[in-house]
Amino acid sequence: AGTPVTIEAPYLFEDSGINKIGDTYYYTYCSNWNTSGNSYGMTSGAIEYMTASNPLGPYTYGGELFPNQGKFFGLYGNNHHSICAVNGQLYLFYHNRSVEKAMGIEGNYRSPQVDQITMTGTKINTVTGTMKGIAQQKSVNPYVKNPAEMMSDQAGINVRGLGDTVVTEIDKGDWIKVSGVDFSKGASQIVLTASSKSGCAVKICTGSPTGKAVGYAEIPAGGKLSEVSAAVQGLTGNQDLYFVFSGQAEMDCWIAK
């Protein structure tokens, strides 16, 4: 084992880590809440970064990567982050309080978000937090089993469990949306694995929850997960797929055939 090295990070609070981008090492961390009057131009509760040519340093302060999320979304709080590279593009994963804001509550509840990181040379440009996020990275393959909780949008539902989870707390009018589904091979049926205590119809449509129905599935009463099939037509090309429920249900997965 090597000798531990202290990184002298100005106004360090928490949430730190090291990433290598190109030939440069980046130490990123959250600043504390007492940064007033500092000589670096940093703000409180923000993600800062330092650079070095060696993972053990010495590190030099580089700038502010991401201000506190309250600057963009209105509710301030601790700032936690991760930097990930996907398909050669860097992304900042962070949390914000947008869901609780929409619910009209203040419990410091955190919801994950992601925005793109851009760079100028070795400088990380300050990331702007948005409610738009990033573009879908690839189309969804409908010809394999897709977990119901893999969705881009939803209304009214919840997800239960860890690992092998299930979409639950579905009631009349609730829906889930799967964006960018590649139906280039077409489809004649969609098979759902779902359950309902009293029976439930599922409208499968495209474009919007009130869009044109391409098929219907009937989930039998009884409360036991089982496969139910919906004959579908008109599914070609890239589609946003909606499952709209007429009543109480749970849904585990779906596949097109």
Where are these regions (language model features)?
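Carbohydrate-active catalytic/glycan-binding domains of CAZyme proteins
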Residues: 1-257
